């Protein structure tokens, strides 16, 4: 009876693990679409300056002047960038991977990687698997010259080639970029911030990030950070 119970318990446990894995893949296939959480467009003001003295980074505020996101980089071109919320909690971690020194690829993870628990190998691999991969377009490849980067979803099926989930077109250098989904619909946009007075100019250090309904603002800001690493 004991052996039979253990066998049944193991089967149920493995089934739950498989179910959780399928659920995680389904969530990854949807991310960063967050239907029902953002019903109107959100406009954020992005300041290319850290709140910490002697740091490179970003400060992001909403239309009411409230701090939403912050980034503090202690080196100019880091291989890891952490997006934090207003209280300093990590939202997303981005890590750089280079292939042959040509392709600039960044993998996006939920939360802060360094502080994750190590309870089991299964949970560890699930937490440490990236959500998305953002790759800079290589200019020598044929295609749309307006494209700056591609966003790919990452799944457990590493052998299957996937089309980009999102395409980033425009010019980050001039702060005129759009993030387009597979149907070429704009889900986020980087725009220059217009001043009320003609005598005032914000330049490229202060700009706007407009996030359309249904798209994750945190991931939209992560794209801004990666474009800055790729093109600044």
Residue ranges and their predicted role:
Residues 69, 91-93:
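Polyanion/phosphate-binding surface patch
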Residues 1-69, 73-79, 86, 103, ...:
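Low-complexity or membrane-interfacial segments used for flexible interactions
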Residues 107:
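An anionic oxygen-ligand recognition environment, strongly enriched in 2H phosphoesterase
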């Amino acid at each position: 009876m004991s052996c039979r119970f253990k066998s049944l318990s193991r089967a149920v446990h493995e089934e739950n693990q498989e179910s959780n894995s399928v659920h995680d893949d389904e969530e990854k296939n949807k991310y960063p679409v967050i239907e029902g959480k953002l019903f109107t467009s959100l406009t954020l003001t992005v300041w290319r300056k850290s709140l910490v003295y002697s740091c490179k980074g970003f400060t992001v505020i909403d239309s009411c002047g409230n701090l939403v996101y912050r980034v503090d980089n202690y080196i100019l071109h880091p291989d890891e960038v952490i997006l934090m919320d207003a209280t300093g909690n990590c939202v997303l971690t981005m890590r750089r991977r280079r292939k042959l020194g040509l392709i600039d690829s960044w993998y996006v993870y939920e939360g802060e990687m360094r502080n994750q628990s190590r309870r089991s190998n299964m949970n560890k691999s699930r937490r440490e698997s990236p959500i998305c991969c953002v790759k800079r377009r290589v200019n020598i490849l044929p295609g749309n010259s307006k494209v700056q980067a591609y966003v790919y979803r990452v799944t457990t099926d590493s052998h299957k080639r996937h089309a980009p989930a999102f395409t980033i077109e425009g010019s980050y250098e001039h702060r005129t970029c759009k993030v387009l989904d597979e149907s070429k619909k704009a889900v986020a946009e980087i725009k220059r911030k217009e001043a009320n007075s003609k005598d005032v100019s914000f330049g490229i250090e202060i700009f706007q990030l407009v996030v359309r309904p249904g798209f994750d603002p945190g991931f939209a800001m992560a794209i801004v950070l990666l474009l800055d690493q790729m093109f600044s």
